[in-house]
């Protein structure tokens, strides 16, 4: 896997899922692996965010999105709970 960086917010959300919902955590981990294989295509319906240039989103489930940015060979996870700017 390439270099993966979590913002403080995203890391706290990731830890939340570890304690609250293993199924959602498993889905997030699957999305992270798929992002490593192809940042802009694959599972979770990857799409660029219209109001945030350079940021992409993938569906975790109906209510939650994984938001990330890829630059210089690294992926920064912005959030993994809620829907975009929640």
Can you say where each PLM-predicted feature lies in the sequence?
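Short secondary-structure junctions
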Residues: 38-42
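Enriched for short, Lys/Arg-rich terminal
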Residues: 1-4, 8-25, 30, 43, ...
């Amino acid at each position: 896997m390439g270099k993966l960086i979590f913002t403080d917010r995203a890391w706290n959300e990731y830890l939340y899922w570890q304690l609250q919902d293993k199924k959602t955590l498993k889905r997030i981990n699957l999305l992270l692996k798929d992002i490593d294989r192809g940042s802009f295509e694959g599972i979770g319906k990857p799409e660029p965010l219209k109001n945030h240039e350079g940021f992409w989103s993938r569906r975790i489930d109906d209510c939650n999105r994984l938001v990330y940015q890829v630059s210089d060979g690294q992926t920064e996870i912005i959030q993994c709970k809620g829907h975009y700017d929640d």
